[in-house]
Amino acid sequence: KIEVESENNLYFYLFQYSPDLTNTKGDNKNFVRLFPNQLDANNYFKKGSYKIPSNNKYDLLLTLEANEISTNELIVALALRKEVSFKQAMTFANFNKILSGIKLVDRREAHIPYSVNKR
């Protein structure tokens, strides 16, 4: 579970960034929206504490491709003053284009690196 502590009302988004999916043209959709999703759609948080998932209908799992031994990825958490429509999967360029259109005073972001290793 991921815990979010909010001091203000905000719209919260959670993404997984997998740089290994990027090809030389940057065409691959390596940003995947984890939250909000079909099972947990309410991403408007008032001041307070929240957990994702907010219910026990799903888990956030880390996996490797069949041919991978390990990978380094990133969780990107965004807190925004206004709601933004993010697609389920985006290229690095598309994600950054949307993000650059949001003023710094209207967003907070956290980047959480992690590794997944085969046992």
Please identify what each model-predicted range represents.
Residues 1-119:
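Secretory-pathway glycoprotein ectodomains that are cysteine- and/or Ser/Thr/Pro-rich
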